[in-house]
Amino acid sequence: MRSATLLVPLLSASVGPASAQPAAESSVFRSIELRGGGSVTVRHGDAHRVTVIEGGTNRPIRTDGDRLVIDECSSDCRGGHRIRVEIVAPEIARLAVANGGRIELRGDFPSQSTVAASVSSGGMIDLRPLEAEQASASIDQGGRILVHARSTLSANVSNGGNVTYWGDPSILSSIRLGGVVEQGVSSDLARPIAEFDPQPPPLPALPSIKPPRRGGGH
């Protein structure tokens, strides 16, 4: 499978079926937003790099200020909804997911003073590899955030959702119309992300049905 690597800043980018819109020429991002589904993996590194691994034909990728935005499908979404992206960045200030999808951090990250995460209308963010002195996590209308905080954690959940945290921070939490803020067990700090977000089991095969026998004449 061919991938497209986007270096930030960019002058141009176009690589066959895995192409994506280039990020703005002179911007460096500190935050990442995923809108409308997909899978994003973030690793720590000295230079900013964005690589489209799969899909993305109709999924614009752009920068807006210090934000890297992976947008929803353009008007014609046939064959272009799914996207899988790998990102390298020296610092992550904020992650956001809206309308489904997942952003996860992998590998080693240096500790930071602050980090923030938000999920709206479904989705998942995994910040466990990054330990922050102060962290904030916000969920509205479903979703899940995994976060690692040392000193303080501000967690807000409304209309359902789950914030699971590691470390021993002071907690300032608000839950409206359902939701959970809970401490994770130490053995789950390195647990694979797929085990937190299991896929539904396949539907059982339908039993074969024999056609009814026609009654004979008398």
Language-model features, listed with the residues they occupy:
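Intrinsically disordered, low-complexity terminal regions
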Residues: 1-11, 16-218
